């Protein structure tokens, strides 16, 4: 855009893509009466790895209280199980290539979440200590995490509060 002339591409352009998608989904919602369901999980929402009025749009957030590592576990579990009296097909419903693919916001070529975030196993363990166990930074470090990484996650957690306050409600 002319307004961006002379500036380097950054998350501004990425957010336009996410917001355009959100705009289209909300228009479909208005037209059909269906509800847009937010795709954010607890890991992403905790640290603000989301776009206001983009992937955060929606009327309900099914994965709001589910860390990303648990999302993968749930996908594997559902592919292996179909509880009695539950609607839906037998067998795998989440394609393995989706589960195996490195997580990405898909807002620029070859982008991976780990370009911006710690690996989810580390991020989720730190977030569980800070969020669920109400541990201090020193206590989380004592669990075996790198102090610089814990501090980075802590700063991200604090900085994302304004986004979490605008997120759709969800399962708790």
Task: Indicate where each model-derived feature is located.
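ATP/NTP-dependent adenylation/nucleotidyl-transfer catalytic domains that generate, transfer
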Residues: 1-172
């Amino acid at each position: 855009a002319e307004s961006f002339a002379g500036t380097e591409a950054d998350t501004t352009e990425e957010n336009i893509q996410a917001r355009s998608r959100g705009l289209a989904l909300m228009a479909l919602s208005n037209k059909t009466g269906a509800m847009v369901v937010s795709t954010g999980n607890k890991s992403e929402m905790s640290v603000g790895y989301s776009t206001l009025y983009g992937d955060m749009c929606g009327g309900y957030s099914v994965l709001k209280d589910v860390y990303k590592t648990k999302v993968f576990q749930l996908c594997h579990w559902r592919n292996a199980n179909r509880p009695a009296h539950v609607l839906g097909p037998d067998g795998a419903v989440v394609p393995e290539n989706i589960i195996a693919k490195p997580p990405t916001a898909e807002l620029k070529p070859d982008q991976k979440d780990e370009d911006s975030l710690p690996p989810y196993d580390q991020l989720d363990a730190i977030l569980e200590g800070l969020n669920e166990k109400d541990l201090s930074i020193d206590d989380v470090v004592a669990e075996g995490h790198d102090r610089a990484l814990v501090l980075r996650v802590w700063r991200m957690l604090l900085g994302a509060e304004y986004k979490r306050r605008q997120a759709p409600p969800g399962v708790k």
